[in-house]
Design a protein with these regions (language model features):
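Acidic-residue sensor for enzyme active/binding pockets
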Residues: 7, 42, 278
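Mobile "lid/hinge" segments at catalytic clefts and subdomain interfaces of large enzymes
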Residues: 15-16, 20-213
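Ser/Thr-centric signal marking residues that sit
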Residues: 4, 33-36, 299
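Feature captures the catalytic cores and cofactor-binding loops of soluble hydro-lyases/lyases
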Residues: 123-324
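Single conserved hydrophobic/aromatic residue that forms the stacking wall/gate
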Residues: 1-14, 19
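Residues that form or flank phosphate/diphosphate-binding pockets in enzymes
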Residues: 7, 106, 274
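Conserved short-loop catalytic and cofactor-binding motifs
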Residues: 5-6, 28, 236, 270
Length: 324
């Protein structure tokens, strides 16, 4: 098959878009899954203060890598292990920062999984309850204007933790890898008023978190949706159902749908997929066709942290186990 001039131009445009969006090494800049879990590692006390947000090309990375190595040796000597740091309270802190930053819906999977590994009961229901009471304060992509580099230059993850702590949303008595508590680590941290990336807790972008949980007849065991940046949080339309993502993507790529539809992708959960892969192709195609606010998507699969538009995921029970 010969490559057409159109395909070459499309490839070049795509390459330029990638360079502009992710101009260097490291994770994508928005508050997607990587940066969400980086914030989580710091607020849980598993990473040194400021270390989780330094952009990949910055020389600060070398300093944090060296200091992290030293701290690991100190923790080994003192017999302090991750399970001594990961507690119910630290997991609540983690859910708080996810909501406050409009983080990835994948945190709804990762946090209960971390808890399970440590023998702690902490379910999606617990995560959702924290989402409900946490203010959304970080104006980060994909729902906002800024990226992780902007957070770091505004003062880093500690200023997010600081204002949340001042508002009573963070447990300050949790132990961290520094050997000190969250509150002790925040002692010399001052909230930077001369930036627009992070709002103080009492002047939020919205009074509740950028990620919310849903329950209903389509999701008796719950579902999750990122609402950060959503203009319209009410949607009603006819359902068009697919039993795998490939079929849904083919429909979208051929524009075989109408605005106002609700696309339902079933059998993409942990058992049905199997593996619960991201519905990235379909959501990206909808976004690329600029219908993110005109078409909704519901699935028992999951999404990329960069998903935009009204996309409800993690529907439980999944279709493969008899879910709706």
């Amino acid at each position: 098959k010969h490559t057409t001039a159109y395909e070459i131009r499309l490839s070049l445009v795509g390459s330029e878009m990638c360079i502009r969006d992710s101009p260097s090494a490291g994770a994508c800049g928005g508050q997607f899954t990587a940066n969400t879990m980086a914030c989580v590692s710091e607020v849980m006390g598993l990473a040194l203060p400021y270390s989780s947000g330094a952009p990949a090309p910055y020389e600060d990375r070398d300093k944090y890598a060296y200091e992290s190595g030293k701290q690991i040796m100190d923790l080994i000597e003192k017999n302090i292990r991750p399970r001594d740091i990961v507690t119910r309270k630290s997991l609540e802190n983690a859910a708080t920062i996810v909501a406050a930053t409009g983080g990835s819906t994948n945190a709804g999977l990762h946090l209960p999984a971390i808890a399970h590994e440590c023998g702690i009961k902490f379910s999606l229901d617990d995560v959702v309850e924290i989402f409900k009471r946490t203010p959304y304060i970080a104006d980060l992509k994909p729902g906002g204007q800024y990226v992780a580099k902007d957070v770091y230059e505004a003062g880093g993850v500690p200023i997010i933790i600081k204002t949340l702590f001042e508002g009573g949303y963070i447990h300050g008595d949790c132990m961290t890898v520094t050997g000190k508590t969250i509150e002790e680590n925040l002692k010399d941290v001052e909230f930077n008023e001369n930036q627009k990336v992070i709002r103080p807790y009492n002047k939020p972008l919205s009074p509740t978190g950028g990620v919310v949980g849903l329950k209903g007849n389509l999701a008796p065991d719950g579902a999750i949706v990122k609402v950060a940046g959503l203009v319209n949080t009410f949607f009603e339309g006819y359902a068009r159902c697919f039993d795998c993502e490939e079929d849904a993507f083919e429909c979208v790529s051929k524009k075989g749908y109408e605005n106002g539809e609700v696309k339902v992708i079933r059998y993409e959960g942990p058992k049905g997929g199997p593996g619960m892969r991201e519905m990235l192709s379909t959501t990206a195609a909808l976004s690329g066709q600029d219908v993110g606010g005109k078409v909704a998507l519901i699935t028992d699969g999951r999404f990329s942290g960069g998903t935009r538009g009204l996309c409800v995921g993690h529907v439980g029970p999944e279709a493969a186990t008899g879910g709706p």
